[in-house]
Structures are given as structure tokens and as C-alpha cells.
Design a protein with these regions (language model features):
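Terminal alpha-helical anchor/extension segments at protein ends
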Residues: 1-389
Length: 389
């Protein structure tokens, strides 16, 4: 994921407040629990030296009623005088945390990257469609609708929608056929209007998923009008009706299933890309020291961290990645085993790039056994020196 919106944080002088908290409010008890958990964090942060004024500002924004539904989290990064980042997380953090330190803490944010799915749900009928922008990238509390509104709609403006049932008699035949043609034309023109809107949103929002539900005939007409970019990310979700889909528990469950399936497929694709590069000696490498060196040389196009098994220098690696415009992704441990919990896809490699073979990567048992704590050389450097000899 491109996290360039974090760059201004790294260009600001610290110290920093880094707060990650489960902000789900499904009932009064969860809202009360949020207030209690924040109260404990606020006391700790004040003891650590965080100014009371900024803590008061954070408390106000954190505890105010939120329109965001479902399970989610909140990430707040601030200096001692101003909030720099206030973001809704697409899932609660792995654990609540709050820090007052010289550098911002980023790993809890990175751990929920896989759940950040940019998707648009389209409930279509023969007159138009209702649009729901769900889990957009980097949603803000103040503008969680991202310009669409919670229930944005598109109406084609062609309202002759129903074919009449006309009794027998040849005198009615031409009228019936003519009306049917006008109705079909209205449906098609309405589909064109919806498709034009969706194509524009797909281009502007860089969506991951376009979810389509509603009237079966309207879906078919809409698909005939959509551009290639929209069709490439289209997924049909059965059981929906315009204006009613999200009120149905069964539909919400199906929507969650389709989204989870996409997340798993995307994780597997990233793991496959990394593994394929490793197996053919391509533009990838792994291991904390190797990745750090590649980041310093500006070689990394995408930093990859294992969720829950990040290396000790993960925060430093993340800052280096942001400083060199590298993307950052996180993978579940079940998808790939990254030595020391870190790997990278490279922009390029040369003779100075660390070896890409599995036997030479950090995390290899033989290599770790050969480590000499009294030596200033890394295992890789000693291996290369032995080869030269």
C-alpha cells in the first residue's frame, strides 16, 4: 500500500503521540469501554510527559459520537501541540497501545493494511443505482463519506420503466410493441448513466472491488455498459435490493464473505510474487540486515513485514521505506515464511545487492549458527569473503 500520506509526519519534529485503539461502538457498553481504556492511556501518557492540552484535544475527537459502524479502530499521530493524523482503521488494532516517544510508532497501523479494501457497493435497479463507498483507503472521521455521501444515488432520468399488459386485438399490437421498445430504451439509457458514473469513480478512487447487487436484468444491462477497468474488479453479490440490501443480515454476511475472500486472494498473490522472485533469483530479498541495506540504497519498491513477527528494527525499516517512496505491505505468517519477518521486492538489483538465494538469507538455520557475536561482519559478509578466498 502507498502510505505517502504519512510522509509529513516523518518531516515533523517530535516527540510524538502514537495512539491505536479499538473504537468499535456496537452498543452502550462498548462506548463506555472505549472511554475507560482511553482514560487509562491518558493517565499513562501524562505521566510520560505528554502535554495535557493535546491529550484533551485527542480525547474530544476520540470520544465524540462517530458515524462509522461495525468493528473498526482508530489511529492518531500527534506532536505535543497538534494532531497530524486521525484515521479510521478498517479493523481494530491487534492490541490497543499508546506511546509518547521521540519517533512515531507505525507498526500497529501497518498490521491492519490487509483489511484496507477500497470497495464500492452498487445496488442497481432499472431506474438507476444507490452507491455505498465502503472501507475506503485512509478514511477520515470528518469526511468518512469521501465525497459520495452515505447513500449516494444515480438516476438515469428515463422513467418509462414498466411494460404494459395490453389485451388482445390487432389494434393494440403496434402500441404494445412501441411501448416495450421505449421501456427497453429507458432501461438501457439508465444503465448507461450508472455506468458512466461508476467508470469515473473507479478511475478517481482507484477501487479494489466493485460490488454489484440488485435487479438481475439491470445488472446485465449495466455490465454491458461498464468499461474494462470497472469490469476487471467487478464482483456480483446475490441477494441485494436497491435501498434494502444492507438492512439484511444475510446480505451483510455475504458481503463480508466476499470481502474476506478478496483479502485472502490478495495476500496469497503477494506471497506468490515474493516466492516466485526468490525461486528464480529475481528482484527480491529477505532478512532484516539485507532489507535495511537495500532501503538505504533506494532499491526497495515494496517492503513486506510478517504480521506479529516483525523484526526488531521494523519501525526503522518502515520509516526508511516511507523516506524512499517505497510501498509497505504486511502478510499473515500463514502465507509465507519471511526470514526475520521481513522481505522486500526490489526496483533493481546489481552486483552489490545481497544474495537472493534462500541459503544465504537471514533466518536460515545454518547461517544463524555461523553467527559470531564478537565479529563486526554480518553472516552474509563472511560468506562472501570466504567465497573470494
Amino acid at each position: 500500500m502507498n502510505l505517502s500520506w504519512l510522509t509529513p509526519v516523518l518531516e515533523t519534529d517530535g516527540p510524538f503521540l502514537s495512539i491505536y485503539i479499538d473504537s468499535t461502538r456496537t452498543d452502550p457498553s462498548s462506548a463506555s469501554g472505549l472511554s475507560t481504556r482511553w482514560g487509562h492511556f491518558r493517565s499513562k501518557l501524562a505521566e510520560d510527559g505528554a502535554p495535557d492540552e493535546i491529550l484533551e484535544e485527542i480525547e474530544t475527537t476520540l470520544l465524540e459520537p462517530s458515524p462509522v459502524g461495525g468493528r473498526h479502530g482508530r489511529a492518531i499521530l500527534a506532536t505535543g501541540s497538534a494532531i497530524l493524523v486521525d484515521r479510521v482503521l478498517p479493523a481494530p488494532p491487534r492490541e490497543d497501545s499508546a506511546h509518547w516517544a521521540t519517533e512515531p510508532v507505525l507498526v500497529p497501523l501497518l498490521q491492519v493494511i490487509p483489511q484496507a479494501v477500497r470497495q464500492l457497493l452498487v445496488e442497481v435497479d432499472r431506474s438507476g443505482a444507490d452507491l455505498h463507498l465502503r472501507a475506503p483507503e485512509n478514511p477520515k472521521i470528518a469526511k468518512n463519506d469521501n465525497g459520495l455521501g452515505e447513500d449516494a444515488s444515480v438516476d438515469g432520468g428515463h422513467d418509462e420503466l414498466h411494460k404494459a399488459s395490453v389485451g388482445g386485438g390487432s389494434q393494440h399490437g403496434w402500441r404494445s410493441s412501441n411501448q416495450e421498445a421505449r421501456v427497453e430504451d429507458s432501461w438501457e439509457r439508465n444503465a448507461e448513466a450508472v455506468a458512466a458514473k461508476l467508470d469515473a469513480i473507479v478511475r478517481e478512487r482507484q477501487l479494489d472491488m466493485l460490488l454489484l447487487t440488485g435487479d438481475v436484468r439491470a445488472q446485465s444491462l449495466l455490465k454491458d455498459e461498464l468499461g474494462k477497468e470497472a469490469l476487471a474488479i467487478l464482483k456480483e453479490v446475490p441477494g441485494g435490493t436497491r435501498g434494502q440490501s444492507l438492512d439484511r443480515a444475510s446480505f451483510r454476511e455475504e458481503l463480508a464473505r466476499v470481502t474476506d475472500e478478496f483479502i485472502m486472494e490478495r495476500q496469497q498473490q503477494l506471497a506468490n510474487t515474493f516466492t516466485e522472485n526468490q525461486s528464480r533469483g529475481g528482484e527480491s530479498l529477505a532478512g532484516a540486515a539485507e532489507v535495511a541495506e537495500a532501503l538505504q540504497r533506494g532499491q526497495v519498491s515494496e517492503l513486506i513485514l510478517t504480521i506479529g513477527d516483525e523484526p526488531d528494527n521494523a519501525e526503522e525499516l518502515a520509516r526508511q521505506a516511507l523516506a524512499t517512496d517505497a510501498e509497505i505491505s504486511t502478510l499473515g505468517a500463514e502465507y509465507v515464511s519471511l526470514p526475520e519477518g521481513v522481505g522486500a521486492l526490489l526496483r533493481w538489483r546489481d552486483d552489490a545487492t545481497p544474495s537472493n538465494s534462500l541459503s544465504s538469507m537471514s533466518g536460515d538455520p545454518g547461517r544463524e549458527t555461523a553467527a559470531d557475536p564478537d565479529s563486526d561482519q554480518s553472516p552474509r559478509e563472511r560468506e562472501e569473503e570466504s567465497i573470494r578466498r
